[in-house]
Amino acid sequence: MYNENPIKRRASTRIYVGDVPIGDGAPIAVQSMTNTLTTDVDATVAQIRALENVGADIVRVSVPTMDAAEAFKLIKQQTNIPLIADIHFDYRIALKVAEYGVDCLRINPGNIGNESRIKSVVECARDKNIPIRIGINGGSLEKDLMDKYKEPTPEALLESAMRHVDILDRLNFDQFKVSVKASDVFLAVEAYRLLAKQIVQPLHLGITEAGGLRSGSVKSSVGLGMLLAEGIGDTLRISLAADPVEEIKVGFDILKSLRIRSRGINFIACPSCSRQEFDVINTVNELERRLEDVITPMDVSIIGCVVNGPGEALVSDIGLTGGNRKSGYFDDGVRQKERFDNDNIVDSLEAKIRAKASIINGRIPVQDLNK
């Protein structure tokens, strides 16, 4: 399949969140955030593990109180994936979770306090080799910037970010990444473009408060897709009012669609029409459900008739072309003598895909499967 990637990624420095490299050409990391009460340790640990199971590289956890900080200590002890502590208002919470092995601190300088408090957090992070994310958000800009610009603008987001980048620079701290999120696509995109020209640190991408599963996925795909196609971005989070597991799936789907990072199966499926020889929609939905555990990069085309089916199958790892009672099967673009009974397509195709994944895995170094 045509898979040339014309994207030239923006050059940046590298930091590490736990053992996950960020920036300087490292694979773009996909992260999410728990939506449980952090003080409910069991529920939070369960959600983190669920996120890890679908491929999350990093998970952010809100730590709003000292009680939550104590819970974070227990959560960290029971999980393996790198954890970011999300800190607002009380800088002392950042100091506390640093004692408990946090992998990264996310602070919003607009509400964390004065420069001396930021300095305390930075000195602690330096001592413990913990990176920081400066998280600028259009909904929580500093009062003086709102007075100056009257509303969130790309320039306001940039000025807020640079104000706090300058603080870290003065403190000789360079282990950080930056985000300038907004809920409006054009506002966020332009802010990131401006920021990308000003600093060399990694950028964390996101359209904040994007919306529900459908609308938020679309908004995030448009905004992040624009930036990623320009080579901007080193980590990302899809902010959805939905199960956080869906954020990881959508994140990987965006990267997969741009051929930046392939994880799992890329299904190529027709929307179906009266020419379909089998139930395309239910077939695809069921295969997506059954094969969520397959992380091997693979293109699978499922087309309901012979109009476009053979052409798509020629450039797929596995292809299915609808036929009368039995459908044609392609392997690596070659039509096979074997045909699938239309009443048993899901089981037959699942078996072929899993077998193909095993073959591909034998050709791909294990460490590359998660790239």
UniProtKB/Swiss-Prot annotation:
Role noted for this protein: Converts 2C-methyl-D-erythritol 2,4-cyclodiphosphate (ME-2,4cPP) into 1-hydroxy-2-methyl-2-(E)-butenyl 4-diphosphate.
Gene3D superfamilies associated with the record: Dihydropteroate synthase-like, Sulfite Reductase Hemoprotein, domain 1
Enzyme class: oxidoreductase
Cofactor note: Binds 1 [4Fe-4S] cluster.
Keywords recorded for this protein, A-Z: 4Fe-4S, Iron, Iron-sulfur, Isoprene biosynthesis, Metal-binding, Oxidoreductase
The encoding gene: ispG
Catalytic activity field: (2E)-4-hydroxy-3-methylbut-2-enyl diphosphate + oxidized [flavodoxin] + H2O + 2 H(+) = 2-C-methyl-D-erythritol 2,4-cyclic diphosphate + reduced [flavodoxin]
Protein name: 4-hydroxy-3-methylbut-2-en-1-yl diphosphate synthase (flavodoxin)
Cofactors: [4Fe-4S] cluster
Lineage: Bacteria, Pseudomonadati, Pseudomonadota, Gammaproteobacteria, Alteromonadales
Any single biological process term in GO: terpenoid biosynthetic process
Family according to the record: Belongs to the IspG family.
InterPro entries, alphabetized: Dihydropteroate_synth-like_sf, IspG_bac, IspG_bac-typ, NO2/SO3_Rdtase_4Fe4S_sf
Molecular functions per Gene Ontology: 4 iron, 4 sulfur cluster binding; 4-hydroxy-3-methylbut-2-en-1-yl diphosphate synthase activity (ferredoxin); 4-hydroxy-3-methylbut-2-enyl-diphosphate synthase activity (flavodoxin); iron ion binding
Pathway: Isoprenoid biosynthesis; isopentenyl diphosphate biosynthesis via DXP pathway; isopentenyl diphosphate from 1-deoxy-D-xylulose 5-phosphate: step 5/6
Pfam family, one: GcpE
Record: residues binding [4Fe-4S] cluster: 270, 273, 305, 312
Entries under SUPFAM superfamilies matching the protein: Dihydropteroate synthetase-like (SSF51717), Nitrite and sulphite reductase 4Fe-4S domain-like (SSF56014)
Species assigned in the record: Shewanella woodyi (strain ATCC 51908 / MS32)
Enzyme nomenclature, EC number: 1.17.7.3
